[in-house]
């Protein structure tokens, strides 16, 4: 049974047991999901015949944080290798709510803790995504950000 985090009622955590562990690149007995979205994607990747291999938070992409100027590690949600006709294609996929794909609306009169948190997260996420795009370009991969709309939610 997934554990529920009451700070965010939409957050769940648990272990995913793949039906096809040979497809998982990493330790298939140690696959952790941190949301129901991740669990849904894991199940889909595991069952999809066109998915040759996949992993969850196994890749490390260094990025420079705009908040402190230091290099940090970014662990994208998924890496996927897919058969597309005679060729294979690799993707790095991040799951995010659609509202996190646009910058926070500036309101100089209201600089609440929540607003400042959103600004920091927006800056941090953009740095991660820029690093992921550069990484993917070098490795002939594609970086995708999936939202609830992409997942049919």
Language model: regions and residue ranges:
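Electrostatic, structured charged patches in enzyme active sites and in nucleic-acid/phosphate-binding
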Residues: 1-153
């Amino acid at each position: 049974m997934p554990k529920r985090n009451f700070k965010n009622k939409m957050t769940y955590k648990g272990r995913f047991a793949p039906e096809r562990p040979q497809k998982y690149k990493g330790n298939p007995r140690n696959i952790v999901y941190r949301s129901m979205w991740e669990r849904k994607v894991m199940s889909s990747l595991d069952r999809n015949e066109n998915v040759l291999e996949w992993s969850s938070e196994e890749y490390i992409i260094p990025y420079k944080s705009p908040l402190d100027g230091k290099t940090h590690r970014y662990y994208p949600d998924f890496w996927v290798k897919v058969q597309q006709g005679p060729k294979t294609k690799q993707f790095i996929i991040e799951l995010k709510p659609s509202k996190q794909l646009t910058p926070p609306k500036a309101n100089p009169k209201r600089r609440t803790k929540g607003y400042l948190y959103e600004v920091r997260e927006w800056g941090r996420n953009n740095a991660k995504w820029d690093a992921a795009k550069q990484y993917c370009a070098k490795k002939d991969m594609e970086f995708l950000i999936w939202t609830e709309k992409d997942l049919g939610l």
